[in-house]
Amino acid sequence: MSPAFRTMDVEPRTKGILLEPFVHQVGGHSCVLRFNETTLCKPLVPREHQFYETLPAEMRRFTPQYKAVLIFVRCADEFGASGNIETKEQGVVSVRFEEDEDRNLCLIAYPLKGDHGTVDIVDNSDCEPKSKLLRWTNKKHHALETEKNPKDWVRQHRKEEKMKSHKLEEEFEWLKKSEVLYYSVEKKGNVSSQLKHYNPWSMKCHQQQLQRMKENAKHRNQYKFILLENLTSRYEVPCVLDLKMGTRQHGDDASEEKAANQIRKCQQSTSAVIGVRVCGMQVYQAGTGQLMFMNKYHGRKLSVQGFKEALFQFFHNGRYLRRELLGPVLKKLTELKAVLERQESYRFYSSSLLVIYDGKEWPEVTLDSDAEDLEDLSEESADESAGAYAYKPIGASSVDVRMIDFAHTTCRLYGEDSVVHEGQDAGYIFGLQSLIDIVTEISEESGE
């Protein structure tokens, strides 16, 4: 059984697992689902799947760990689906679309484990929704569910689905206008659980993707997802910066219209000038106890100076600059640049670079503190006074730099590509060098 499924196996067979939206998704338009604490589900794009399957060894530490392929296959009824894992060891899940009490679409996975690792196929009754799992209210979701005429119900159901789709489009338009948002966080609570219904970008991507999947269920037999490492799982308050890298975003297979649109976006943003632009940001501001969200529409409007200020804001917690993070970031950016300079014929068109660190404030502890103080460190509340730390727990200064999104990546290993490039991806490397220069400038100006 794939390691990604061990968590599911300990659950009773009648219980389901809610495939939640990944609340720390700050950019992109693909729906990313949280499979478990350490694993994410992302819609499979053949080219991206090929990239992970043929990934050069020296690039692995700069990308999320690739785990498996998950296939959702439509069940006998229009609202059900089953899935299996394409790994050396087989595992199977059944999935269904349901609605929560707020009428939002949910995708539920039910583990099906047979003897000796074989697959059990069960009838649809085993896929009934579990009220405890989804925290349903006892009231009926549809007043029309009790109607005798099925045609009336179907007509009403289709009408409601169209209204939902239209509402999602309106909410996305609102998101485009609301380019920077703030959300107050309770310090004692789990940040990820608090954000389940409040990260505006991940929620809208989630609902839009599930709505499309449900609408297309009658015309499509299966959906494929890849399982990837959840890069934010080891951070208590993940601060995430999504940077669109390179001077060119369209793939070689893009239509003329698509290519022209991507060229225009690059020309009108910092992509053309410095080879990088902000695609999304989530940062914790300790001064106000708020998470700040910046979306890609704001990122496109930034000047080079505005980009630098956004980068400064990402490393600033509202009280002081997190200077201890700048050195590790520079080290990893420099190492990544050296690795990419050795990659022949690769082009990472429309790929992003994630920078992640923990926004949790760690209390100041002196070096002569007793063992009990150090043992209880992770449970103490944040120190309200700003200043340098005499002692930092392991991970307090940890920062991660990873490449993601390879749907338009190409190299000569992909034999079916009509265009084969020579040498390095100069546009991506140019963007990395710009990042290195700007972070270095921020570090020097702050007295690092």
From Swiss-Prot:
Its subcellular locations are: Nucleus
In this chain, substrate is annotated as bound at 238-246, 258-265, 408
Q: Found in which tissues?
A: Highly expressed in brain and lung, and at slightly lower levels in liver, kidney and testis.
Annotated residues that bind ATP are located at: 229-231, 242, 405
Fetch the InterPro entries from UniProt: IPK, IPK_sf
State whether keyword Amino-acid biosynthesis applies.
Answer: no
Q: Name one GO cellular component term.
A: nucleoplasm
User: Recorded E.C. number(s)?
Assistant: 2.7.4.-
| Pathway membership, UniProt | Phospholipid metabolism; phosphatidylinositol metabolism
Which UniProt key words apply to this protein?
A: ATP-binding, Kinase, Lipid metabolism, Nucleotide-binding, Nucleus, Phospholipid metabolism, Transferase
Decide whether keyword Ribonucleoprotein is in the record.
no
GO BP, sorted A to Z = cellular response to flavonoid; inositol phosphate biosynthetic process; inositol phosphate metabolic process; negative regulation of cell growth; phosphatidylinositol phosphate biosynthetic process; positive regulation of apoptotic process; protein stabilization
Q: Which GO terms describe its molecular function?
A: ATP binding; flavonoid binding; inositol hexakisphosphate 5-kinase activity; inositol hexakisphosphate kinase activity; protein-containing complex binding
Where's it mainly located? nucleus
Q: What is the reaction catalyzed?
A: 1D-myo-inositol hexakisphosphate + ATP = 5-diphospho-1D-myo-inositol 1,2,3,4,6-pentakisphosphate + ADP
UniProt-listed SUPFAM superfamilies: SAICAR synthase-like
Q: What class of enzyme is it?
A: transferase
Q: Which family does it belong to?
A: Belongs to the inositol phosphokinase (IPK) family.
Function, as annotated, reads: Converts inositol hexakisphosphate (InsP6) to diphosphoinositol pentakisphosphate (InsP7/PP-InsP5). May play a role in the regulation of Na(+)-dependent phosphate cotransport, possibly via its role in diphosphoinositol pentakisphosphate (InsP7/PP-InsP5) biosynthesis.
Name of the protein in question: Inositol hexakisphosphate kinase 2
Source taxonomy: Eukaryota, Metazoa, Chordata, Craniata, Vertebrata
